[in-house]
């Protein structure tokens, strides 16, 4: 496949984001020298440099370790880039940090810029975009926010860098992406681009887009909008189907969803969408038909929670596989049988089906995926939180050496080793004393 048809995430970095105090990099690049499960790695060459990219990753860690914060940070960066500024918004995202940015800084830090860095491949270009935001302290609503630093690189060459001033190198941008006649009066163009730039606005989506390279910025924004799908709360997904001939009370059978649900073991004859009488929306519904009953019911009333959840998530999987891109989901596997998810993982590892090299990233508590026959060591990620500093740390199983007391050897039982705390990112939990105290007091647990 040509590079132009591939859209992949290479890495994502953060600093001073919620529980992540220090700079942390989440990598989707294959670890050097690691062998095995090569079918889950694909190669992309950009400007003569070969990149070995992972097609999946699973993230482990105890409750409150920061797993969701890592995924939430991807969502926040996406929202900021698409909005083009760092002002609060009332758009109602489930990720409150995307709406209320004073929730972002690590508690206890002062005057430390929050960092977001992302590196991805789109249309044969290696794109790296970095923003550092001065957001003040945690919950500081009155702080005058500003962009501390902003850098765009294409194929490892700096296109622009913004600090106190902005330096633009349009010679590092292919001519086809530049605005017409921009090179005829570059100094005047720079002055116009910088003069109207507010401190809380991104140069990328404002002056750089308007004055220098509209087509390049459109390409970047397209990746964030359509190729990076971050589901911060996967239990909240409600897919709405649009139809050109929408009629009230009409039932639209969805063959694909029905086939998927039958693999799951649904009780109804078919799944589809029924048009609401009150609005121009549709409701996922089950059709029940036998010799005694003929009815259409909302699927949430009739099917199991896990079935409805999987059916709502499945269109996202289809879209990623058909169009390419990166699908990131918080607790993707909750209420879904692990065998179903294992099949999805294997599909992302299958070049005959995953022809556009889509990527799947999710966090989980289910240890069944700690399997050397399912995931490579560099695809198994961990997040743990220090009990003293309350800061999160992220690492991969491939970061461990292959020898020594905590070494990870080929063919080992990853699940067993995880539960004996060989890899960290696990916490002993014992509610016995709390419950004994409550019971001994006759159930009175008032403080």
Enumerate the predicted regions with their spans.
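Electropositive, glycine-dotted interaction segments
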Residues: 128-272
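P-loop NTPase motor core
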Residues: 101-166, 396-412
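Conserved ABC ATPase signature
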Residues: 56-60, 276-318, 326-339
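Extended helical coiled-coil dimerization/tether regions that scaffold
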Residues: 15, 231-302, 422-429, 433-447
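C-terminal lobe/lid and adjacent interdomain/linker elements of RecA-like ASCE P-loop ATPase modules
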Residues: 6-11, 17, 343-447
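Conserved P-loop NTP-binding catalytic core
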Residues: 44, 50-58, 62, 72-135
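Short acidic, glycine-rich loop/turn motifs
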Residues: 14, 118-124, 152-154, 287-292, ...
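Pre-Walker A-like glycine/lysine-rich segment at the N-terminus of P-loop NTPase domains
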Residues: 2-76
